[in-house]
A protein has these predicted regions:
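N-terminal export signals
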Residues: 1-14
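Mature catalytic domains of secreted/periplasmic carbohydrate-active enzymes
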Residues: 12-346
Length: 346
């Protein structure tokens, strides 16, 4: 474990972005985080289950619905117009209330997951759709305030810990600023051609983001063009998730975001874990970028993939049985396929 951090070095690492983190063995630099070591429980926990569930599941049209519904010609775009109306009037904000979770039963689900052999459980925290599934203090777009009107993350956490399972949360928020750019577009053809989608309404900017008028329409999976204000908002929001739900694992959908903001968040996660475990870091952070995890720092995650050779450090693969968000009439992976994957990976 890392030794004591000089006060001047600690202050310099945090002052760059004006970020406050839990004091402990780490500061928000790559050099400091190299001292991180993966906890033994994660090495031994070979199988976990993830509930990739949120408001985009409500239409039952598969993954990325909140983005695809604004892409003219996409099946989700057509389905949305048929079942909700034109995107200039009825957008994703109007889909959210249909996500009610009337039959949500985390206790029953966790019993099933435990019987299946899962040693840890993941709850969705927030997807690219900018909707928090916890009692978030940084946005009104959360599951306690609307939709199910339940603390989904909190209820899942309670059920998992009750059964001795480790608890994880996933965050996909960082890219939301760019991902939702299509909601500021308009139809190119038809009776609504040129009529802006509902993302351009200032009343909805806290969901769809207040994008500059000249913001590039082409989506790219990076942080180019993302303002510091959004980076700070991301840090504050995910820190709120960490502080209130103390996850054993925090998963980011992509690489570690926004350099000093992301590094400070990971340092905060590890330091808070050390505070709660007598100086021992029991938390795990995952990144999909190999370079992030080359020396300590975090656990490498492969989405729908796996390592090409035996690795000295533990890694994780995440995959789904069908579509990431629920999709009606889709073929699921067979039990044999799932078992073969587990045998191959574990």
């Amino acid at each position: 474990m890392a030794g004591a951090i000089p006060a001047a070095r600690r202050a310099a690492a945090q002052q760059a972005a004006g970020l406050e983190i839990q004091k402990g063995p780490f500061v928000g630099t790559r050099d400091s985080l190299k001292a991180y070591r993966v906890p033994e429980w994660f090495r031994d926990a070979k199988f976990g289950i993830w509930a990739h569930w949120g408001p985009q599941s409500a239409p039952e049209q598969g993954d990325w619905y909140a983005r695809k519904m604004y892409i003219e010609g996409d099946p989700a775009y057509k389905w949305h117009q048929q079942h909700f109306g034109p995107q200039s009037k009825v957008g994703f904000k109007d889909v959210i209330p249909t996500f009610k979770g009337e039959k949500f039963d985390p206790e029953h689900l966790m019993d099933l997951y435990q019987k299946a052999g899962a040693k840890y459980f993941f709850s969705m925290g927030v997807h690219h759709d900018n909707f928090d599934l916890w009692n978030s203090k940084h946005t009104r777009w959360n599951a306690v305030n609307m939709g199910p009107k339940k603390d989904i993350v909190g209820l899942f956490r309670k059920a998992a810990l009750k059964r001795g399972m480790k608890f994880g949360v996933s965050e996909h928020l960082w890219i939301s600023y760019k991902w939702f750019g299509v909601s500021h577009d308009s139809d190119k053809t038809g009776q609504y051609a040129g009529v802006p989608y509902d993302g351009t309404d200032p009343k909805n900017f806290d969901l769809y983001h207040d994008l500059p008028k000249d913001y590039p329409a082409q989506f790219s999976w990076d942080d180019k063009g993302i303002p510091d204000s959004w980076k700070r908002h991301w840090f504050d929001r995910i820190k709120d998730l960490v502080d209130n739900y103390q996850p054993d694992i925090l998963y980011t959908d992509g690489a570690l975001p926004f350099e000093e903001y992301g590094l400070n968040l990971v340092a905060h996660l590890y330091n808070d874990s050390a505070r709660r475990h007598g100086g021992k870091v029991e938390a795990v952070y995952t990144s999909k970028l190999r370079e992030d995890c080359a020396e300590g720092t975090c656990v490498l995650d492969f989405e729908r993939g796996l390592a090409d050779a035996i690795a000295p450090n533990p890694w994780q693969t995440d995959t789904c049985v069908g579509s990431w968000h629920y999709q009606r009439d889709i073929n699921y992976k067979s039990p044999k396929t799932v078992i073969d994957m587990l045998v191959d990976i574990v």
